[in-house]
């Protein structure tokens, strides 16, 4: 059924406070309740609602003291117990016969945690997605537990840090002064803008009554802050939450740090956790992540196969390091690409492999399958931008957006620049540089739009910083890849997408056999002889592509920005930084 327009009503809470409730979306769909925190209103969810409206019946409401809801005067009317009463009243009237899915932020989330402590809550709540609003019991136990163990410096210092990050609540608890200052401050457009950080203006959702709402609802702080330290339950006295819960943990939240959630699993046996690179107001900055999390949880409740993202997020579930992870590797028919695909498969990943040679990429897929892995082979010319975009579209539709993208495909070219045909020089740039650019554009955009991070690996070479006159096309393409990766890394960092540049040294692959040699005036026999000498040198080096693959896997785990591979690659990398003139002199060396 088509989504309906927003409708509103007032619901009475047990203490007589009237709660303004808004409902919209699919009237025949499952109900999802969206609960906001401070200083927001139901408007906080304006970016999320369109992503849920087709499937869900959406219920959201203004907390007491906010918007069209009543404004009780006593501070005691703003305890989390009252917030839980409000939530109970809303779902009791709007969804009396069916359990609801819940997405809640900040104090709204804390109030839902309070509700889940109550008997029978698991019959009313089908799932709970919590954003930047931990249970008071859980967080206080984390802090007290750390402070009691000064002999564990890391735990002790984290507990102190978390306590200090919440100390602003004491200031917000000062009567008269706090409401007045908030009303004045939030009347300023500049303050409202700075409060949410660098979120694009069109994604900022504040009500017109934000300043007034904040002045009224700031009573939430004196009603709960000091009380939480004295009345929170401890250890085994904390009730077990028998509801599926997923935490969306914002790594840049200045108030509740990621480690503040580390003990949640003690009291929530069915727990999922998604860490994203976002600040406190992630419902505005990452609405697609909020919506995807709700959809995934609803699918799970419906008995559908959980998504890879949900499987990865499940706390306590045994899996390989890259289990439930999708990895794309280009140039996977042989050499470094093939070994990289095999290495990630050993770590539990599903692999999307591509190569311009259909026979070799299918052989790699068969090898992965024979070892118990899963691989999806594709034929791809990475130099064709349209083909790469179509490939990315198809892969994303059939398997999902890859979590890790390895742009490896490359070719060699030997010969002096003036001896190399223009089309051959351009082909090297098109594959070695263009292939990387095309892959980053196609998949990088999708990773950013998805909003949950990821990792890109661009395979360059030590040739990026070790020039050779007989490898001008190859060195140029790899140096450009190196610099392009440095630039893109800084751009993608804001979205939580990592980027590693791999710089292999002399690696024993088939690249020499497939490299074009151009030396006018030299007969083919001499060229073949020289090719054989170089090939033998690579073989005697005995440094195989499997070692590069292991380095790639390790670099992704450790989030390394640059990773030379092989001793000579490390040595030349260091020399390029300390004695660049020494390396420039090596450019005089000739391969042929």
Curated annotation (Swiss-Prot):
Q: Which NCBIfam families match?
A: PRK05855.1
Q: Which residues form a coiled coil?
A: none
Q: Which family does it belong to?
A: Belongs to the short-chain dehydrogenases/reductases (SDR) family.
What is the recorded name of this protein?
Answer: Probable oxidoreductase EphD
State the organism's lineage: Bacteria, Bacillati, Actinomycetota, Actinomycetes, Mycobacteriales
Q: Where are the transmembrane segments?
A: none
Give yes or no: UniProt keyword NADP: no
Q: Which Pfam families match?
A: Abhydrolase_1, adh_short
Per the UniProt record, the source organism is Mycobacterium tuberculosis (strain ATCC 25618 / H37Rv)
